């Protein structure tokens, strides 16, 4: 039973809109508020809703420390401290992303409150369509996620829980054998403390030693779980297709060509990618080439 409540109002830097709850069933929209349960390891239920130009966070937990941790993780996940104004100012007249930057300057990458959640979900998303990946994630949450005291919310599975799973158990959630092995190995490394996801580069190096974990998984972890706007998941099929079209290649681009295409946007390659994909999906194919750093600055 919750004995501590922490409530605070935050004013996001620049234009802001709530992200969608997603399709894994962890973050819920209820009565105008985004709600989820977070463990540290104590359980906290945290809610977020708009109030007079700000966002109010309210966390209830057994201890004040757990409630504070939950609000900190929720503000990261919702991008409430994510200041993209320098990026917008620098590239607002870019021929590719300038128009959508001026129309929708609130777009931010989807984030996860815990880096392990981003890592686990990136592994489930390898080489499959998004709908199937979401179904796998929902199955993992139902089977291994930690339930809230009220019984209506579930957190994503903890690394300690997945570390104890057998390959066949994860395969029963429709995860391919190789992905199941990778998820178990990664979970064991994190649970044992051999991989510290708060230490970005050292963690990436150790994760890359695990079979079936490659650059795309690391870049997805970095962007969605570690707040790295410079880490574009360049191997994503959407980027391979988009760059192939924009660069006039007549084929899908290679990963190296995607990285080269987005190099002028450094250190905001991932932000540029988010906006470029939105421009492509919302208004049809975008046209042009990136501005040089000098011209866009």
Language-model segments: which ranges?
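HhH-family (HhH-GPD) DNA N-glycosylase catalytic core used in base-excision repair
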Residues: 1-297
């Amino acid at each position: 039973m919750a004995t501590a409540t922490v409530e605070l109002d935050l004013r996001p830097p620049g234009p802001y809109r709530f992200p969608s709850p997603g399709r894994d069933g962890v973050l819920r929209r209820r009565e105008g508020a985004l709600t989820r349960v977070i463990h540290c390891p104590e359980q906290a239920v945290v809610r977020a809703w708009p109030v007079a130009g700000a966002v109010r966070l309210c966390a209830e937990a057994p201890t004040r420390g757990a409630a504070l941790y939950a609000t900190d993780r929720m503000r990261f996940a919702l991008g409430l401290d994510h200041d993209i104004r320098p990026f917008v100012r620098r590239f607002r007249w870019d021929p590719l992303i300038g128009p959508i930057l001026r129309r929708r300057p609130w777009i931010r990458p989807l984030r996860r409150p815990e880096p392990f959640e981003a890592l686990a979900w990136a592994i489930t998303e390898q080489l499959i369509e998004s709908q199937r990946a979401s179904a796998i994630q929902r199955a993992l949450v139902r089977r291994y996620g930690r339930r809230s005291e009220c019984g209506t919310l579930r957190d994503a599975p903890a690394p300690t829980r997945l570390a104890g799973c057998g390959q066949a158990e994860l395969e029963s959630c429709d995860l391919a054998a190789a992905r199941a092995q990778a998820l178990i190995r990664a979970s064991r490394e994190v649970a044992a403390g051999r991989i510290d996801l708060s230490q970005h580069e050292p963690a990436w190096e150790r994760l890359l030693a695990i079979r079936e974990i490659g650059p795309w998984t690391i870049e997805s972890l970095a962007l969605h779980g570690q707040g790295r706007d410079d880490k574009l998941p360049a191997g994503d099929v959407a980027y391979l297709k988009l760059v192939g079209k924009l660069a006039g290649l007549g084929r899908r681009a290679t990963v190296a060509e995607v990285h080269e295409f987005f190099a002028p946007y450094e250190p905001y390659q991932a932000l540029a990618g988010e906006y470029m994909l939105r421009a492509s999906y919302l208004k049809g194919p975008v046209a042009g080439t990136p501005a040089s750093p000098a011209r866009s600055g």
